[in-house]
């Protein structure tokens, strides 16, 4: 009979421990439920806010069709703009004369597909509108300067070998259109003054402006006054072969042809060339913008010879 009280006390301790444990479990469940409720409420508020205040990306594809007459024949040009993939597609012609021009603003490429030739030509393009910069200071005539060439004096010539590695067009709309045809890079080739003189000697009837004022009026929409070219700078292109050049390929240096194709430097040039093109300045709307403000803006860049860059790294220039 004397051993019963300790047994009862031991049972009381066990009951108290179980009760305390159940209280801790209930308290933990309450805390977890409160945290879960706060998280759920936060997610609901974020979802509601993003739905009502976050600008939704339009999934609509914009299209436009233009009809015109050429040599008495009715022709159509259609344009399709996809703001999600940032592509712009132009279609013209029918059957074997059909041509597709794809502007991929996301990856910075332009693809031109000719159905009759079953060939695709690729060139690079800008991805964004360049920032406006102040006009350059006047350059001394006696200084070694570059020659300015405008887009009208550039011919796009395809490369001799087709493109083998197409991984750079993996996520581009161009690859979907040109996947089963041969693809070539096209490179800008400058028209020298000597070539224009050859046309005159052959008896071609070329209608050049008879006065300086008339020439400026005709080209006013293409050339801005800040980048007009002097005649003395044009004529220096004819004697370009007489200029000295440091050819580092004799020392075992080989230039990647992609440097020339992408426009980083010119492998076979003896002097730098200033290449100008007209860039469409947007009037708001979805990207890519199909509208140009006052015909666009002239953007120029200087492409130096690849040998010049090597000489600069060696400290020779």
UniProtKB/Swiss-Prot annotation:
Residue ranges constituting the BRICHOS domain according to the UniProt record: 93-186
**Top-level taxon in the UniProt lineage:** Eukaryota
Residue ranges in the Cytoplasmic topological domain are 1-30
**Record flagged with keyword Transport:** no
Q: Where are the transmembrane segments?
A: 31-50
Q: How does it sit in the membrane?
A: Single-pass type II membrane protein
**Ranges per topology, Extracellular:** 51-317
Choose any GO biological process term that the UniProt entry carries and state it. cellular response to BMP stimulus
> What residues are glycosylation sites in this protein?
94, 180
Name the InterPro entries on file: BRICHOS_dom, Chondromodulin/Tenomodulin
Where are residues bearing Phosphoserine located in the sequence? 239
Protein location: Membrane; Nucleus envelope
Recorded hits in Pfam families, A to Z, give: BRICHOS
Q: Describe its function.
A: May be an angiogenesis inhibitor.
Q: What is this protein called?
A: Tenomodulin
């Amino acid at each position: 009979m004397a051993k019963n009280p300790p047994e009862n006390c031991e049972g009381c301790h066990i009951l108290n421990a179980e009760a305390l444990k159940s209280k801790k479990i209930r308290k933990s469940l309450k805390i977890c439920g409160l945290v879960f409720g706060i998280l759920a409420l936060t997610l609901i508020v974020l979802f509601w806010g993003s739905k009502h205040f976050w600008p939704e990306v339009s999934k609509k594809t914009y299209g436009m069709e233009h009809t015109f007459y050429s040599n008495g024949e009715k022709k159509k040009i259609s344009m399709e703009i996809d703001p999600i993939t940032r592509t712009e597609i132009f279609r013209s012609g029918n059957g074997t004369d059909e041509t597709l021009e794809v502007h991929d603003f996301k990856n910075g490429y332009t693809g031109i597909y000719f159905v009759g030739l079953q060939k695709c030509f690729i060139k690079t393009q800008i991805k964004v509108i360049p920032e406006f910069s102040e006009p350059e200071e006047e350059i001394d005539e006696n200084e070694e300067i570059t020659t300015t060439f405008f887009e009208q004096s550039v011919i796009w010539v395809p490369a001799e070998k087709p493109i083998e590695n197409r991984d750079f067009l993996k996520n581009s709309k161009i690859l979907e259109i040109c996947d089963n045809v041969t693809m070539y890079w096209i490179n800008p080739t400058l028209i020298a003054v000597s070539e224009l003189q050859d046309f005159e000697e052959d008896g071609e009837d070329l209608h050049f402006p008879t006065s300086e004022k008339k020439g400026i009026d005709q080209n006013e929409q293409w050339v801005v006054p800040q980048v007009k070219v002097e005649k003395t700078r044009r004529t220096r292109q004819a004697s370009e072969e007489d200029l000295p050049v440091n050819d580092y390929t004799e020392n075992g240096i080989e230039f990647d042809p992609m440097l020339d194709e992408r426009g980083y430097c010119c492998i076979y040039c003896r002097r730098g060339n200033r290449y100008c093109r007209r860039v469409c300045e947007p009037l708001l709307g979805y990207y890519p913008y199909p509208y140009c403000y006052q015909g666009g803006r002239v953007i120029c860049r200087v492409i130096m010879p690849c040998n010049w860059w090597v000489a600069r790294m060696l400290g020779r220039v």
